[in-house]
Regions:
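Bacterial N-terminal signal peptides that target proteins for export
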Residues: 1-12
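Bacterial N-terminal signal peptides
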Residues: 11-20
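Sec/Tat signal peptide C-region and signal peptidase I cleavage site
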Residues: 23-27
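Acidic, polar low-complexity linker/tail segments
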Residues: 31-96, 101-108
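C-terminal "exit" segments of structured domains
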Residues: 41-46, 245, 255-352
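Extracytoplasmic
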Residues: 45-49, 64-66, 90-96, 116-117, ...
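Exposed acidic/Ser/Thr-rich ligand/metal-binding surfaces
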Residues: 93, 108-113, 119, 123, ...
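Cytoplasmic C-terminal tails of single-pass
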Residues: 350-373
């Protein structure tokens, strides 16, 4: 073998060995799962339940040992009271499908496409799951209250008709109000093909309406987000992305029926595969202070997910009942300092008035007109 061929062979072997050594590390970095806090339920505070999705680069759920999920509240590592997920599947999922039925959905069979995709989502419901349907154009219609009846849901979906303008934010406010008293994992999936142009509410109102039990909002844009030249075809993609990011959801868009159906089905798979961790907050009082949460995945370089919650409390709670007597005493002193000067001033004024001689009352002068003879 010539020296040239020998050198070439050695070079090839060296490259193959280097690729073998580098590839696993590179693949591991590329395959780090994405951890997202989708919902924080503080309705039973100081017991807090955090719902977490773990997905791969394609957005598909990843199965892990729940004990690998590490949670910190205000920098304090949490010891969970209960963990669900993986083998212990989350009991139930409540979803509100919010669908755009404005006039633009009539074009290019968009509404028919959306109906078929929504029915594909309904087909993935498990025993214990329930779904509702709300449609919006200029008006908001609660087309189907929450139910586990798949056939009833499909009938409601088929009844939708496209007309008028778009009031997406108003519909989302209504949907959050409906879901507020519902316990457990709950989510809104909203589909639209255009821009909100008649709502009385905005994105901030929607986020503010999410109550202590929390929920997530995922958004779907139907159409081509790069085509803003036509009013009926343009999607307000920045607004949909911001809404999903702020509400613990996900944004995606579809240009065709098959893609839209796959999106709905993937959203269902991800939510049904989430993890729920329940713990007791280190700060057990509803003191109105915001708590910072972080979730990370042990033994990986996955990005740490951060979120925040506020347990509420207009009047801060007092941990020691004996402190109430101190509080009431302090309140009484403050009230005394507020009212005593006013009372003393009034008494002094009355005493001064009593010493002064009362003025004589003058009889009124009556003037008569002279009679003319």
């Amino acid at each position: 073998m010539s020296s040239g061929r020998k050198s070439l062979s050695i070079g090839i072997v060296t490259l193959l060995l280097a690729a073998t050594l580098i590839s696993p590390a590179w693949a591991q970095d590329q395959a780090e799962p994405l951890v997202i806090i989708t919902q924080i339920d503080t309705s039973q505070f100081p017991s807090v339940t955090v719902y977490i999705s773990v997905t791969d680069e394609a957005g598909e759920p990843v199965g892990i040992d729940p004990s690998r999920l590490l949670i910190q509240e205000n920098g304090v590592t949490i010891q969970p009271d209960q963990m669900q997920g993986n083998a212990a599947v989350i009991d139930s999922l409540t979803t509100m499908l919010v669908m755009d039925v404005s006039g633009s959905m009539y074009s290019a069979n968009k509404l028919d496409t959306a109906k078929e995709a929504a029915k594909a989502y309904v087909d993935q419901m498990r025993p214990g799951d329930q779904t509702g349907l709300m449609s919006f154009n200029t008006e908001i219609t609660y087309a189907q209250p929450l139910t586990a009846d798949v056939d009833q849901l499909k009938t409601a979906i088929d009844s939708l008709v496209a007309d008028k303008d778009t009031a997406m934010y108003d519909a989302l406010v209504e949907a959050t109000d409906v879901l507020d008293p519902v316990p457990g994992r709950k989510a809104i999936i909203v589909l639209t093909d255009g821009m909100d142009n008649v709502s009385q509410n905005d994105l901030g109102n929607v986020i503010a309406r999410i109550g202590p039990s929390g929920l997530s909002i995922s958004t779907i844009g139907l159409g081509n987000p790069e085509d803003q030249s036509a009013t009926l075809a343009g999607i307000d993609e920045p607004a949909l992305i911001e809404l999903a990011n702020r509400a613990g959801g996900e944004y995606a868009y579809a240009n065709d029926p098959a893609g839209l159906t796959r999106l709905y089905q993937r959203y269902a798979r991800v939510m049904q595969s989430e993890y729920a961790i329940t713990y007791t907050s280190p700060g057990e009082l509803r003191d109105g202070l915001t708590r910072q949460l972080t979730v990370s995945l042990a033994e990986t370089n996955a990005t740490t997910e951060a979120a925040a919650y506020n347990p509420g409390g207009l009047v801060p709670e007092v941990g020691d009942p004996a402190s109430w007597s101190m509080f009431l005493t302090a309140l009484a002193v403050l009230l005394a300092l507020l009212f005593v000067p006013a009372v003393i001033g009034r008494l002094v004024s009355q005493a001064s008035s009593a010493k002064l001689p009362s003025p004589r009352k003058r009889k009124p002068k009556i003037k008569f007109k002279d009679k003319q003879v």
